[in-house]
């Protein structure tokens, strides 16, 4: 009887492994190194995020990104796809939106008129934009934006992450001329974008690589790229300026040895797991319920961190930090509230 059960189980695994197609094609992520971080120094465990106030709880779902006008007006729009990044144009009039399904949009908050600037089908070199994610705008009106994957769409983000997909792109859309330019490709889940205060380089988040790249858009290094910071203690989402002159990085998930094994190593095992489990559930299961945001200086060093180790108030899934000098506002791609954390008592 026991032998029959064992044989049946082995037969099941044989069928799954050899005959059932996998929805992903996992690769060994060997171009970057991950080490389980030590929570010491600027990463010393604290509970600062437990002081966060929940705004609009139950009235919003997945408030991924924020943009603030000169009046501080709160607006809700229902007619959209999945906006993942927002910035006001340099005139402070129109809101430019990176929408995962509709591409780049221009929204007039006063008239509520929505204009499609760059539909996903436009693409580049025959590859449509499958997953427009985040953006920033320079003084000339050029929109720098990321396309997280040339293969997967937003509702398939877990598949891109689990697979180790490196088809992400950094693009420049020159509004004045209508020219579209490829700046970087081969990115591991390209995510947040931030122009430096000097305007000479961009910081581009590679979510699945747990690192941030620097790409020069001006000066003698124009067109070159380098690592700004790597081996972050989790998976970074968006990056925004801090009031102290550095940058805030929202961490969507804290890194552990378990999710390292699950997401980075053993491609054949990941291939098998993708056949057996629902990947969005599996990826969520891999991450601890831990809220974390980081402040970086201009050189990419972590200067401080705010944490919620138990996830009792801010349960991870943080997508963006907006700093107005007195308050941090925390966005999320999954939570049903917008976080508000007072910086000064």
Regions from the language model: what does each represent?
Residues 108-112, 174-178, 216-221, 297-301, ...:
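Short loop/turn segments that connect beta-strands within beta-propeller blades
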Residues 14-53, 164, 290-299:
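Blade/loop signatures of beta-propeller domains
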Residues 233-311:
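Loop/turn-rich, solvent-exposed surfaces of beta-rich toroidal or solenoidal domains
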Residues 77-81, 98-161, 167-168:
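Asp-box/WD-like beta-propeller blade repeats and closely related beta-sheet repeat scaffolds
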Residues 68-72, 88-92, 137-140, 197-199, ...:
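Residue-level detector of Asp-centered blade-edge/turn motifs that repeat once per structural unit
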Residues 54-59, 76-79, 117-127, 182-188, ...:
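Surface loop/turn motifs at the tips and blade-to-blade linkers of beta-strand repeat domains
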Residues 25-32, 145-165, 252-287, 340:
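Short, conserved, GDST-rich strand-edge loop motifs in beta-rich repeat architectures
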């Amino acid at each position: 009887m026991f032998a029959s059960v064992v044989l049946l189980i082995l037969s099941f695994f044989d069928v799954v492994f050899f005959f059932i197609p996998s929805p992903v094609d996992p690769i060994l992520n060997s171009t970057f190194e991950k080490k389980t971080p030590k929570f010491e120094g600027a990463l010393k465990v604290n509970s600062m995020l437990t002081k966060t106030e929940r705004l609009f709880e139950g009235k919003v779902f997945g408030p991924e990104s924020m943009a603030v006008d000169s009046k501080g007006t709160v607006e809700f729009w229902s007619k959209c796809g999945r906006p993942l990044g927002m910035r006001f144009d340099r005139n402070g009039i129109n809101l430019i939106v990176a929408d995962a399904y509709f591409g780049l949009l221009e929204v007039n908050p006063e008239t509520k008129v929505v204009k499609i600037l760059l539909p996903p089908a436009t693409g580049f070199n025959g590859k449509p934009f499958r997953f427009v994610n985040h953006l920033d705008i320079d003084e000339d009106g050029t929109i720098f934006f990321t396309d997280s994957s040339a293969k997967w769409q937003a509702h398939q983000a877990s598949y891109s992450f689990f697979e180790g997909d490196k088809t992400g792109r950094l693009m420049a859309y020159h509004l004045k001329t209508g020219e579209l330019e490829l700046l970087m490709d081969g990115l591991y889940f390209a995510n947040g974008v931030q122009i430096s205060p000097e305007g000479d380089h961009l910081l581009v988040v590679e979510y699945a690589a747990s690192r941030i790249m620097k790409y020069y858009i001006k000066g003698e290094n124009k067109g070159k790229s380098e690592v700004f910071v790597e081996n972050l203690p989790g998976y970074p989402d968006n990056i925004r300026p801090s009031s102290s002159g550095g940058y805030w990085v929202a961490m969507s998930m804290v890194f552990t040895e378990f999710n390292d094994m699950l997401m980075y190593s053993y491609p054949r095992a990941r291939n098998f797991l993708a056949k057996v489990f629902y990947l969005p559930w599996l990826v969520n299961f891999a991450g601890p319920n831990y809220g974390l945001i980081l402040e970086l200086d201009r050189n990419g060093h972590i200067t401080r961190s705010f944490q919620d180790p138990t996830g009792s108030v801010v349960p991870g899934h943080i997508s963006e930090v907006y700093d107005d000098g007195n308050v941090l506002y925390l966005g999320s791609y999954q939570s049903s509230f917008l976080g508000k954390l007072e910086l000064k008592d």
